[in-house]
UniProtKB/Swiss-Prot annotation:
<comment type="subunit">
    <text>Heterotetramer of two alpha chains (FadB) and two beta chains (FadA).</text>
</comment>
<protein>
    <recommendedName>
        <fullName>3-ketoacyl-CoA thiolase</fullName>
        <ecNumber>2.3.1.16</ecNumber>
    </recommendedName>
</protein>
<dbReference type="InterPro" id="IPR020616">
    <property type="entry name" value="Thiolase_N"/>
</dbReference>
<feature type="active site" description="Proton acceptor">
    <location>
        <position position="377"/>
    </location>
</feature>
<dbReference type="InterPro" id="IPR016039">
    <property type="entry name" value="Thiolase-like"/>
</dbReference>
<feature type="active site" description="Proton acceptor">
    <location>
        <position position="347"/>
    </location>
</feature>
<dbReference type="GO" id="GO:0010124">
    <property type="term" value="P:phenylacetate catabolic process"/>
</dbReference>
<keyword id="KW-0442">Lipid degradation</keyword>
<dbReference type="InterPro" id="IPR020617">
    <property type="entry name" value="Thiolase_C"/>
</dbReference>
<keyword id="KW-0276">Fatty acid metabolism</keyword>
<dbReference type="Pfam" id="PF02803">
    <property type="entry name" value="Thiolase_C"/>
</dbReference>
<keyword id="KW-0012">Acyltransferase</keyword>
<keyword id="KW-0963">Cytoplasm</keyword>
<dbReference type="InterPro" id="IPR020610">
    <property type="entry name" value="Thiolase_AS"/>
</dbReference>
<feature type="active site" description="Acyl-thioester intermediate">
    <location>
        <position position="95"/>
    </location>
</feature>
<dbReference type="InterPro" id="IPR020615">
    <property type="entry name" value="Thiolase_acyl_enz_int_AS"/>
</dbReference>
<dbReference type="InterPro" id="IPR012805">
    <property type="entry name" value="FadA"/>
</dbReference>
Length: 391
């Protein structure tokens, strides 16, 4: 493949293991510490990458308060070998924050405003709960349903509109855990996971090397025993078919193709196109459909051209309508979330965009796929998507 000088390439990408938000393995580890460990690991894994080359550290984070406040990207950068002369910014597009960090860096590279960027995201949902400090504007109810702020109810709405049954959701949830467990057992996550020191259930320091969130014993039958979590009387969405609340971080090295060549670094993929789109907040989970269609059009591609997909599993009742309308249900077992998804691994809000992209790129490398798409829904009615091409 011939690369243009300003093509945006990925040199390396990593993530932490995913820890449960409630009394999990990272209950005594801060968000900045998780992120800084990934940046240090990227420098260790890529000795030709000079910290002085970094133009900007761009980090996604949703709830920017407490340890995640006051420009957490800069707080993270100051914990690493990156010099003070390099800049840092925190971005927030709710669930799409880390993917927006990728897009922000990519746009800078494409326009000649920098060559080397460290991007990623973090959310410590154990230390900073999802709605910590949020004050909803009552006037917003004139323009969108108040229930649009309750993600589980938006999933209920989307599932009902598309005729998605409780049984289909339970099957999808069980699939996520089964595939994530298989990926762990077969070592498919090893290249992307950076082991991080945490604590076991007894409080002893332990090197965390695998995701804490996967429940291999999960079946559709066991999920079928759970009560609806958001609409107790008529609902179909349960805690078992929703993304888990977790603590985690993800990180990538993005740079221009010409700078990667000059530094002697071998890129693993390039960005073909990017897109964001909006939708009705009441069905916020539908956002990946318009965003993906827009990104594919910009790349001159069709759905059937894509070898592998990573769709953030906010809810099974949200994922299945998206796959249905993208005409992917028939090829799901061959192409979609082959190592499980957020139902098994969790969805640390500001982290997930780079996490699913990291997992996708590792799948593409392992299986030899040429083209991949990572896409996700975003609270209050948005979607974001990235088209990747393996090098």
């Amino acid at each position: 493949m011939s690369l243009n000088p300003r093509d945006v390439v990925v040199v390396d990408c990593v993530r932490t293991p995913m820890g449960r938000a409630k009394n999990g393995c990272f209950r005594n580890v801060r968000a900045e510490t998780l992120s800084a460990a990934l940046i240090e690991a990227l420098f260790e894994r890529n000795p030709k990458l000079d910290p002085k080359e970094v133009e900007d550290v761009i980090w996604g984070c949703v709830n920017q308060t407490k340890e995640q406040g006051f420009n957490v990207a800069r707080q993270i950068s100051l914990l690493t070998r990156i010099p003070h002369e390099s800049a840092a910014q925190t971005v927030n597009r709710l669930c799409g924050s880390a993917m927006s960090a990728i897009h922000t860096a990519a746009q800078a590279i494409q326009t000649g405003n920098g060559d080397v960027f460290l991007v990623g995201g973090v959310e410590h949902m154990g230390h900073v709960p999802m709605t910590e400090g949020f004050d909803h504007n009552p006037a917003a109810s004139k323009y969108s349903a108040k229930a649009s702020n309750m993600m589980g109810l938006t999933a209920e709405m989307l599932a009902k509109m598309h005729g998605i049954t409780r049984e289909q959701q339970d099957e999808f949830g069980a699939r996520s855990h089964r595939l994530a467990h298989e990926a762990t057992q077969e070592g498919r996550f090893k290249n992307e996971i950076v082991p991080i020191e945490g604590h076991d259930e007894n409080g002893f320091v332990k090197l965390i090397e695998e995701d804490e969130t996967i429940r291999p014993e999960t079946t559709a039958e066991s999920l079928g025993q759970l009560r609806p979590a958001f609409d107790p009387k008529n609902g179909t969405v349960t805690a078992g078919t929703s993304s888990q609340l977790t603590d985690g971080a993800s990180a990538m090295v993005l740079m221009s193709a010409e700078r990667a060549e000059a530094l002697g670094l071998t890129p693993i993929a390039k960005i073909r196109s990017m897109a964001v789109a909006g939708c009705d907040p009441a069905i916020m989970g539908y956002g990946p459909v318009p965003a993906t269609k827009k990104a594919l059009k910009r790349a001159g591609l069709k759905v059937e051209d894509i070898d592998f997909w990573e769709l953030n599993e906010a809810f099974a009742g949200q994922s299945l309508p998206v796959l249905k309308d993208l005409k992917l249900l028939g090829v799901m077992e061959e192409k979609v979330n082959l190592n499980g998804g957020a139902i098994a691994l969790g969805h640390p809000l500001g982290c997930s965009g780079a996490r699913i992209s990291t997992t996708l790129l590792n799948i593409m490398q392992a299986k030899g796929g040429k083209l991949g798409v990572s896409t996700m829904c975003i609270g209050l009615g948005q979607g974001i998507a990235t088209v990747w091409e393996r090098i």
